[in-house]
Amino acid sequence: MSYQEKNTMPSIMDALVPMVVEQTSRGERSYDIYSRLLKERIIFLTGQVEDHMANLVVAQLLFLESENPDKDIYLYINSPGGSVTAGMSIYDTMQFIKPNVSTVCMGQACSMGAFLLAGGTPGKRHVLPNSRVMIHQPLGGFQGQASDIQIHAQEILTIKQKLNKLLAEHTGQPLEVVERDTDRDNFMSADQAVEYGLVDSVLNHRGQ
């Protein structure tokens, strides 16, 4: 994950979102597939974590809270990670709102994606059996005057300490273990992620 924002261009796949047609008392009504799933309180967090995507996820979390503050929200994650600040806006909103947020990893949850996966409601964090989870320390780069480089270096160290502390709280691992395990890219299988405490269970089929 990076503590600096990376601009990403919308994918051409964004224009290929399937539409769903429903029959209502007022006739047919069409939704894009993600809007239809939002009605079921399902949010998708996919791709690079960046400001635009984070704003959309935060808006959906707040909307679903306003719709029903007592009903769970389901956050499906398939992300390689991204900006720390964008990710933390999602994380803070997850902790702020009243509904429980159940997180599900499908495909991959790496870096900030893994952090958000672990930040779901305890007992309601899941991973699909062939998914991969990866934790590591934040990435960053800066160029400029020596004094400014020193300031940014201290900032990324501060962020590293904060993330490690929160990850220790969510996993139940000692802080020194998290610091050791995030020193380099640390990939885990679904079962290993459960054992580490990043998630609570592996979902092999619906109904578990």
From Swiss-Prot:
Record carries keyword Protease: yes
Gene3D superfamilies for the chain: 2-enoyl-CoA Hydratase, Chain A, domain 1
CDD domains xref list: S14_ClpP_2 (cd07017)
UniProt catalytic activity: Hydrolysis of proteins to small peptides in the presence of ATP and magnesium. alpha-casein is the usual test substrate. In the absence of ATP, only oligopeptides shorter than five residues are hydrolyzed (such as succinyl-Leu-Tyr-|-NHMec, and Leu-Tyr-Leu-|-Tyr-Trp, in which cleavage of the -Tyr-|-Leu- and -Tyr-|-Trp bonds also occurs)
Gene Ontology molecular-function annotations: ATP-dependent peptidase activity; ATPase binding; serine-type endopeptidase activity
Principal location: cytoplasm
Subunit (UniProt): Fourteen ClpP subunits assemble into 2 heptameric rings which stack back to back to give a disk-like structure with a central cavity, resembling the structure of eukaryotic proteasomes.
Cited function: Cleaves peptides in various proteins in a process that requires ATP hydrolysis. Has a chymotrypsin-like activity. Plays a major role in the degradation of misfolded proteins.
NCBIfam families in alphabetical order: clpP, PRK00277.1, PRK12553.1
Name of this protein: ATP-dependent Clp protease proteolytic subunit
Organism in which the protein naturally occurs: Vibrio atlanticus (strain LGP32)
Highest classification ranks of the organism: Bacteria, Pseudomonadati, Pseudomonadota, Gammaproteobacteria, Vibrionales
